[in-house]
Amino acid sequence: MIQRINALSLSSGLNWFVTSLKIHGNNLKTLKQSHCYMIITGLNRDNLNVAKFIEACSNAGHLRYAYSVFTHQPCPNTYLHNTMIRALSLLDEPNAHSIAITVYRKLWALCAKPDTFTFPFVLKIAVRVSDVWFGRQIHGQVVVFGFDSSVHVVTGLIQMYFSCGGLGDARKMFDEMLVKDVNVWNALLAGYGKVGEMDEARSLLEMMPCWVRNEVSWTCVISGYAKSGRASEAIEVFQRMLMENVEPDEVTLLAVLSACADLGSLELGERICSYVDHRGMNRAVSLNNAVIDMYAKSGNITKALDVFECVNERNVVTWTTIIAGLATHGHGAEALAMFNRMVKAGVRPNDVTFIAILSACSHVGWVDLGKRLFNSMRSKYGIHPNIEHYGCMIDLLGRAGKLREADEVIKSMPFKANAAIWGSLLAASNVHHDLELGERALSELIKLEPNNSGNYMLLANLYSNLGRWDESRMMRNMMKGIGVKKMAGESSIEVENRVYKFISGDLTHPQVERIHEILQEMDLQIQSKV
């Protein structure tokens, strides 16, 4: 390689060398040979050449060596500092972020001027370390250097403030901007979506000029609604997006399919699947995974299996999604067979896969198999069980009536049990009439979620099942005394791509009178046939 460079001019030689590194090798020995050649030929006197080399080193995963090269450069300019800061900002390591801040401060110490490319990289560091005070310092420096009118820099500042909890600062910056392009609008929309401020996001979308809105604008709001558990509103905004003839992209469709899955909206979900097929987007693994998830959660596990078998490419998420779907539908044997098939295919299960397969064992009652799988997580796959895995084990043992063993598992956990763990034990105590454990589980639940009526009702029912009517009555009176109300039941139905939700005792539905008329007619017809 060195001989080949000698035949070229020095600058073109380095370009060829960097390109060759990307193609032929990225080991440290090759990089050091390159660096030696740069020093011998004097190429290292040009900061542009050194920046290219640092970029090649960081892309090859040798950032420590890249930083060493940077620190030995006698007169690094702004471009070289930017290259080093950018490389460090891409790493998800606290040490790298502190080094990036040091590099930025060296830029100031050398009296070199930061430019519009410096600040977005440094703001990413502020986001990574969640340091709003450092971010505010950068904001002040942006103003000092006159870059507060740069859309590129302001967008970075808005993203930083949202990520660090400074919502008011982000909105103030936005409102004070005289010229706003679509990227600034979208940065604010994405920020509101990220923190769940969906009313603000919706208001901003309505305020946004229609000629500025693009598919990213709509997607920010749709995705925000979907992640905030407001699936109906996500679908409503998606339908408006289509009415305005804005083409959804892959990210949009992922969010909408997620909303359909949460609502169980099979009719609309199938329409979106047809759209995906028609647009030739069904080769995207992430979309196929979302389609499988939508069918499984909407009750059509057969269709979910059909899609799974038809896809050309599967990753761990694909396998986990179908295993979880089978488990949820009570097909424990099929879920286990799918898990074994996944392992034979050479796909390594992850922590979510084990939640799905342990859930399948729980539904079927395979206690011994569940224990073996749980133990294999650490011994075979190097996965440390988290609280959800322990929750699956408590559920598995509780359903099987092994309540004392479940209690021992809770005591052995490396972290404190949460409400889901104690709730599972309380439910199992109710089924298997274990009053002692039931009372202890409720006492823990009252500390964690004192207003959850379901917990009190479970213990009240346990007292009733054991014929202890006074304690059952006392439990219900206790609920009234502390103001805990029984959660109203609810149901839903999908009609013409719209999901209607009904809540027990709710009088706010716009067609409540007509609903009660129909119910009375149905009641009369039922009574006439009895």
From Swiss-Prot:
Record InterPro entries: E_motif, Pentatricopeptide_rpt, PPR_At4g14850-like_plant, TPR-like_helical_dom_sf
MF-aspect GO terms: RNA binding
Alphabetized Pfam families for the sequence: E_motif (PF20431), PPR (PF01535), PPR_2 (PF13041)
Organism domain of life: Eukaryota
Region listing for Type E motif, in residue ranges: 421-496
Keywords: Repeat
Residue stretches of each PPR repeat: 77-114, 115-149, 150-180, 181-211, 214-248, 249-283, 284-314, 315-349, 350-380, 386-420
Region feature Type E(+) motif, mapped onto this chain: 497-527
Coiled-coil residue spans: none
Gene Ontology biological-process annotations: RNA modification
NCBIfam families for this protein: PPR (TIGR00756)
Protein family membership: Belongs to the PPR family. PCMP-E subfamily.
Name of the protein in its database record: Pentatricopeptide repeat-containing protein At5g56310
Lineage: Eukaryota, Viridiplantae, Streptophyta, Embryophyta, Tracheophyta
